[in-house]
């Protein structure tokens, strides 16, 4: 066996293992760990913290009224809760609708904060948070609808001082659509993993539609970053906890067409190189314990799918050319077939083919994110996906 074959085989096996670990291996390991450790009891507090619910919006005139009606219909003590709409320089009727709602609900503490410049969700949150004096800050999107007890559930999870962040469960309501169903299937599995991570120590990422943090521990991140990924990472690296409460529920529509879902995934990967760099910092199990294991398996290995698929393909081509073994040619054929099925899945009504297609556009979106990072095209703002409203 030549040197190039040996190197190619090592690269192939390593990249395939990381792909397997990202998509199946880590989740399997979590479930094994959970079985061995047993299900830990989740603690809750009865203490009623003062709360501000922040709704972040940019040109959300179609949903902001319904969101306000939804969020004020909660079972939290009225004297302990405030509402704040952080408008990211909305240019439609969003601000006017909110102002009119405030006039018609003078018995409630509702305020509107407007950013002078359109610099994205995180910037609007950073600016609006400066006016918050509550103990707990709940943050949510304009198109995510809460259950009546969602705020209470989020707040009840702050049972210990080391818990700085709580993420709720996002449920999709339009799973009859192929694209939405693919996202929902992935998300259901994701929530199981978060639940296990949370019980053991801490989660590695949240969800921008439904989460809360201690206001005193709010971190001002650069506008290009998002709280979903940055907050749990920050707290985890500082030995604090970000946890998941499956009973704090929000409902939302998933993207119903590939274009909307692809744009969302590209946006999610706008700082993918930073995430990979952060993963390297977290890769110290002696210092960070369980968080190090969780972050590598749940985040870093997934952030590396784009390069591992490329390495697996290139090394497989080399092995198929230089090796006499038919095995490598069969594996290469299987890889090519996989991508062909992914292309066919775009128009197919087959759930399996569409899942393969959905996976392929996820990898493509990572490449797009890498391109934007390198060329400086990554930006903190985006246009909302109309199919999610």
Task: Identify the residue ranges that each predicted region occupies.
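Cell-envelope/extracellular polymer assembly enzymes that use nucleotide-activated donors
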Residues: 49-52, 82, 230
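Catalytic donor/gating beta->alpha subdomain of glycosyltransferases that bind UDP-sugars
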Residues: 158-189, 223, 227-296, 361-364, ...
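Short aromatic/hydrophobic "clamp" motif used to bind/position activated sugar donors
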Residues: 137
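Short, acidic, metal-binding catalytic loop of nucleotide-sugar glycosyltransferases
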Residues: 69-80
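Membrane-embedded multi-pass helical conduit in multi-pass membrane proteins
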Residues: 4-5, 32, 44-45, 252, ...
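A conserved acidic beta->alpha catalytic loop
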Residues: 87-96, 117, 144
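N-terminal membrane-anchoring/stem segments of glycan-assembly enzymes
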Residues: 1-45
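Long helical/loop segments within the catalytic core of UDP-sugar-dependent glycosyltransferases
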Residues: 113-114, 122-124, 134, 148-225, ...
């Amino acid at each position: 066996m030549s040197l190039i074959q040996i190197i190619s085989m090592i690269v192939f096996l390593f990249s395939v293992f990381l792909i397997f670990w990202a998509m199946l291996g880590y989740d399997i390991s979590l479930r094994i760990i959970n079985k061995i450790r047993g299900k830990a009891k989740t603690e809750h507090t009865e203490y009623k913290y003062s709360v501000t619910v922040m709704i972040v919006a940019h040109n959300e005139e179609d949903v902001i009224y319904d969101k306000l009606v939804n969020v004020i219909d909660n079972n939290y003590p009225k004297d302990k809760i405030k509402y704040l709409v952080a408008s990211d320089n909305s240019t439609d009727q969003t601000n006017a609708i909110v102002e009119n709602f405030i006039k018609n609900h003078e018995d409630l503490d509702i305020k509107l904060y407007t950013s002078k410049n359109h610099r994205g969700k995180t910037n609007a949150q950073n600016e609006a948070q400066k006016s918050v004096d509550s103990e707990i800050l709940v943050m949510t999107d304009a198109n995510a609808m809460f259950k009546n007890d969602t705020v209470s559930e989020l707040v009840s999870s702050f049972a210990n001082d080391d818990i700085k962040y709580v993420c709720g469960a996002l449920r999709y309501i339009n799973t009859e659509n192929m694209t939405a169903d693919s996202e929902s299937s992935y998300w259901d599995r994701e929530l199981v993993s978060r639940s296990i991570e949370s019980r053991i120590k801490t989660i590695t990422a949240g969800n921008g539609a439904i989460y809360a943090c201690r206001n005193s521990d709010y971190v001002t991140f650069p506008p290009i970053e998002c709280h979903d990924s940055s907050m749990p990472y920050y707290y985890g690296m500082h030995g604090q906890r970000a946890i998941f409460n499956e009973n704090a529920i929000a409902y939302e529509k998933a993207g119903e067409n590939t274009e909307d879902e692809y744009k969302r995934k590209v946006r999610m990967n706008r700082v993918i190189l930073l995430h990979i760099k952060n993963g390297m910092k977290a890769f110290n199990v002696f210092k960070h314990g369980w968080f190090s294991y969780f972050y590598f398996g749940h985040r870093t290995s997934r952030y590396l799918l784009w390069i591992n698929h490329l390495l697996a393909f290139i090394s497989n081509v080399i092995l198929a050319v230089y090796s006499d073994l038919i095995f490598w040619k069969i594996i290469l054929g299987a890889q090519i077939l996989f991508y062909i099925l992914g292309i066919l899945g775009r128009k197919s009504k087959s759930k399996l083919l569409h899942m393969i297609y959905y996976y392929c556009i996820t990898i493509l979106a990572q490449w797009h994110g890498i391109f934007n990072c390198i060329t400086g095209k990554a930006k903190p703002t985006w246009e909302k996906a109309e199919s999610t409203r």
